[in-house]
Amino acid sequence: MVDKLTHLKQLEAESIHIIREVAAEFDNPVMLYSIGKDSAVMLHLARKAFFPGKLPFPVMHVDTRWKFQEMYKFRDKMVEELGLDLITHINPDGVAQNINPFTHGSAKHTDIMKTEGLKQALDKHGFDAAFGGARRDEEKSRAKERVYSFRDSKHRWDPKNQRPELWNVYNGKVNKGESIRVFPLSNWTELDIWQYIYLEGIPIVPLYFAAEREVIEKNGTLIMIDDERILEHLSDEDKARIVKKKVRFRTLGCYPLTGAVESEAESLTDIIQEMLLTRTSERQGRVIDHDGAGSMEDKKRQGYF
């Protein structure tokens, strides 16, 4: 009797197949590691794909300098425990200009520290393929993106100039100067991610679990007081509005641009139960997604992941 693969095992097999295909087809791939839950799952799948050997490519974190402190601690812990070959890149031009989300706004901060920083790192190391943990259920521009997302010599995405992927056959031929972004988790949902984390025992950043945290409401978004830098940009009136609430994060990014949600979910089973009932997008708390209609697609056309 042949055992049928479960839904999650089918997704796992598909993702591992994609990761192995890229490793075989491309000369110099890299796996982006943003420290979030999707990156954790993607890294776990990559380690499975090449077990018992080591990853045949490095992992890279494009650092904006504004991630949550717990994310940095978690990143360093994973690098040490797993023996990862980690590349960290910070846009030196952004550092020189002291680009930050308060003074320069979310759009400029994201463009310089994330998009331009990523493009710099890819060019510097000559990577021809970059894995990312984006999923189609996250956002409408990602919903129409291929697993192999082709980029031109300036890393720009043209949604009208992509290749068909019939029967899970991926064409990895690129012209000189071109590269691809690869999304092994394209067909996963947020619920799939959490169920897989639970079943596989994958470690994640504690910020995903509900706890009492200091927050301030800004334009309807609960922003966590993660370090003293945010206090420099708050008025005395704003500081008086800082309160403690039981919150967690469904998605993680730069902390001044990432909203928390009120929640009682303190465990993986609690989170899964919450996911079964929720009807809102996990990216509702991402300030950068509200920069304007079609803002994510515009960012991707310029080279954003």
From Swiss-Prot:
Q: What is its EC number?
A: 2.7.7.4
One annotated GO biological process: hydrogen sulfide biosynthetic process
GO MF terms on file? Answer: ATP binding; sulfate adenylyltransferase (ATP) activity
Reaction equation(s) it catalyzes: sulfate + ATP + H(+) = adenosine 5'-phosphosulfate + diphosphate
Keywords, A to Z?
ATP-binding, Nucleotide-binding, Nucleotidyltransferase, Transferase
* InterPro entries given in the database record: PAPS_reduct_dom, Rossmann-like_a/b/a_fold, SO4_adenylTrfase_ssu, Sulfate_adenylyltrnsfr_sub2
UniProt pathway: Sulfur metabolism; hydrogen sulfide biosynthesis; sulfite from sulfate: step 1/3
**Which Pfam family name is an example for this entry?**
PAPS_reduct
Q: Which HAMAP family match?
A: Sulf_adenylyltr_sub2
Assembly description: Heterodimer composed of CysD, the smaller subunit, and CysN.
Write down what this protein is called.
Answer: Sulfate adenylyltransferase subunit 2
Name of the gene = cysD
